[in-house]
């Protein structure tokens, strides 16, 4: 039986952001796993994920898509764009995980929109990671 890399990758990215000195300085560590009610802006949400696996009798690889969101109420979208760019720079690279071999990562999509309240700037970046399993359970 193979155990998905999804949870380990999600937790690693979440913890990497929470402990990042730039996130600590600029956002006071405001990284969450869901949208916040009565939030202090800006903040980051490590959000939705999906997994596509390719299993054979002797190996397993997974493509994991992970979407991150940035919310800002700055006057313009510059802050949001800068934070999205920052997320791409620090996360679009190898993330070492026990029992999994990193193959590649890439930015699948990124965009900045204005939320329905017409004030909140919402940045979205979707990253794709490919891992090979090194352990079968």
Predicted regions and their residues:
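Short, charged interaction patches at domain edges and termini
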Residues: 1-16, 51-63, 101-137
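Small/polar-rich, solvent-exposed N-terminal microdomains that initiate assembly or binding
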Residues: 1-50, 82, 89, 98, ...
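Polar helix-capping/helix-linker motif
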Residues: 19-20, 93-94, 121
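Short, solvent-exposed beta-alpha or beta-beta edge segments that form flexible loop/patches at the rim
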Residues: 27-74, 106-111, 128
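Mid-chain, well-packed structural core segment of small domains
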Residues: 72-93
